[in-house]
C-alpha cells in the first residue's frame, strides 16, 4: 500500500513538473516579420506550443525595428520578437529562449544570425552548431552553443 501511494505521489510530481516546465516564459509576444516570410509564422507556432500568445505584425521596415531593439549589425534575421523585457532575433532554438528567461541576464536580447536549417521554423536536420548570442546596445557576446 505504501509503495502504491509513493508511486502515485512521484508520478503526480513528475506530471506537475512537466506542466510547469515553461512557466518562466511570458504569456505574450509580438513577432515582426516580412509579409512574405512563412518560416516566421512557423517559429510563432513553436512559441505558441510553449503557451505564449503570439501577435504577428507584417512589416517591411524591419531595419528600423531591429535598430530600436539593439540588434547588432550582422546578427539580423528574418524576424524580431518582443517578449517580456527582451528581444529575440531570428530562429533561436526554444532551449535558448527558455534559458534566457531562467537566467534573466541584463541584456536587450538574444539572437541567432541568418536562417539556419533545423532551427524552429526552418525545415531539415541540424547541420551545424547554433551559436546564440546575447546582445545589448548593438554589441554581441556568446550566450550558448546548441
Annotate the PLM regions.
Residues 1-5:
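Positively charged n-region of N-terminal signal peptides that target proteins for export
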Residues 7-17:
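Bacterial N-terminal signal peptides
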Residues 23-50:
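Local sequence-structure signature of Cys/Sec-based thiol-disulfide redox active-site neighborhoods
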Residues 28-29, 52-54, 84-87:
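Short active-site oxyanion
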Residues 36, 43, 58-61, 93-97:
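Stable alpha-helical elements in mature extracytoplasmic
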Residues 44-64:
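Conserved helix-turn-beta segment immediately C-terminal to the redox Cys motif
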Residues 68-146:
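Thiol/selenol-based redox catalytic cores and closely related redox-interacting motifs
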Amino acid at each position: 500500500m505504501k509503495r502504491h501511494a509513493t508511486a502515485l505521489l512521484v508520478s503526480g510530481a513528475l506530471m506537475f513538473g512537466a506542466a510547469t516546465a515553461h512557466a518562466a516564459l511570458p504569456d505574450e509576444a509580438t513577432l515582426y516579420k516580412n509579409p512574405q516570410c512563412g518560416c516566421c509564422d512557423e517559429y510563432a507556432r513553436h512559441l505558441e506550443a510553449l503557451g505564449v500568445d503570439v501577435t504577428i505584425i507584417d512589416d517591411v521596415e524591419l531595419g528600423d525595428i531591429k535598430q530600436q531593439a539593439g540588434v547588432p549589425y550582422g546578427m539580423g534575421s528574418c524576424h524580431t520578437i518582443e517578449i517580456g523585457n527582451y528581444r529575440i532575433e531570428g530562429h533561436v532554438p526554444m532551449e535558448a529562449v527558455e534559458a534566457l528567461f531562467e537566467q534573466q541576464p541584463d541584456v536587450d536580447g538574444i539572437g541567432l544570425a541568418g536562417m539556419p536549417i533545423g532551427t524552429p521554423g526552418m525545415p531539415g536536420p541540424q547541420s551545424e552548431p547554433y551559436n546564440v548570442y546575447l546582445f545589448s546596445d548593438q554589441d554581441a557576446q556568446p550566450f550558448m552553443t546548441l
